[in-house]
Amino acid sequence: MDLFQTLVLALVQGLTEFLPISSAAHLILVPELTDWDDQGLAFDVATHVGSLAAVVIYFRHELRRMTAEWLGSLAGRGLTPDAKLAWAVGLGTIPAGLAGLLFHDIIATHLRSAQVIAMATIGFAVLLLFADVSGKRTRDEHSITWKDVLVIGVAQALALIPGTSRSGITITAALLMGFTRQAAARYSFLLSIPIIALAGGFEILGLVKEPEENIQWGMIVLGALVAGVSAYLCIHYFLKLLAKMTMLPFVIYRLVLGAFLLFLFW
């Protein structure tokens, strides 16, 4: 893997992890357009580590408060908004975790085709548009209820379908529940922390079972750094943009991307 390939793939991972545009669609498109070989599991682990570091660093102050208040709730000091948000992140991860354990083999065998990815990219773009137009957009993430946690958590499980976009489907669900665009995105990004950690851990187990030979450690480290920096900038500017714009540009992009994938692979 050369320098240019490392930079492109790390940027794709860092940007598509948090934008509602489907990382699977891009990760199938890039090799098709470039004819590159598979980058290997070690590189995937590195870019996931970079993305995870980015979201943890970006929300470090919120995470510190949430952790302290969560520990306080365990000690019987009541359920403050930050403690409830911490519980919401943990409990909201359960549906996707269970679905991943139960349906991983089925998804890997039957749903990783380019056609499925293209149709999911298009279909969930339409749903995102509907949520953006119809949602009340009056609530922030600290007003979250257990019903919200269940709905958004189940929605996140749908992201196991390639082409859905984890951030896209969780933002969609949060908008439908009345959250503002920024609050929907913030909760989605907080939810990504345990999910990315679980995915990275699963990949590390695979790497331990079947170690790769001739790992290019320089490119691995570079990939993690590029993915991390690009993910951090993506989170920062995406949240700023949501204060001024709708989801329409991302919907249009997904529709065009999905149509292009159908054109290439149908």
Swiss-Prot record:
Enzyme class: hydrolase
Reactions mediated catalytically: di-trans,octa-cis-undecaprenyl diphosphate + H2O = di-trans,octa-cis-undecaprenyl phosphate + phosphate + H(+)
GO biological process: cell wall organization; peptidoglycan biosynthetic process; regulation of cell shape; response to antibiotic
Chief localization: membrane
Organism: Thioalkalivibrio sulfidiphilus (strain HL-EbGR7)
Localization terms from the record: Cell inner membrane
Family: Belongs to the UppP family.
Keyword Hydrolase in record: yes
Annotated GO CC locations: plasma membrane
Pfam families referenced in this protein's UniProt entry, alphabetically: BacA
GO molecular function, one term: undecaprenyl-diphosphatase activity
Intrachain disulfide bonds: none
Job description of the protein: Catalyzes the dephosphorylation of undecaprenyl diphosphate (UPP). Confers resistance to bacitracin.
Other comment: Bacitracin is thought to be involved in the inhibition of peptidoglycan synthesis by sequestering undecaprenyl diphosphate, thereby reducing the pool of lipid carrier available.
Keywords recorded for this protein, A-Z: Antibiotic resistance, Cell inner membrane, Cell membrane, Cell shape, Cell wall biogenesis/degradation, Hydrolase, Membrane, Peptidoglycan synthesis, Transmembrane, Transmembrane helix
EC number(s) from the headed UniProt entry: 3.6.1.27
Mode of membrane association: Multi-pass membrane protein
Name used for this protein in its record: Undecaprenyl-diphosphatase
Membrane-spanning segments: 8-28, 39-59, 87-107, 113-133, 188-208, 219-239, 246-266
InterPro entries membership: UppP (IPR003824)
Highest rank taxon of the organism: Bacteria
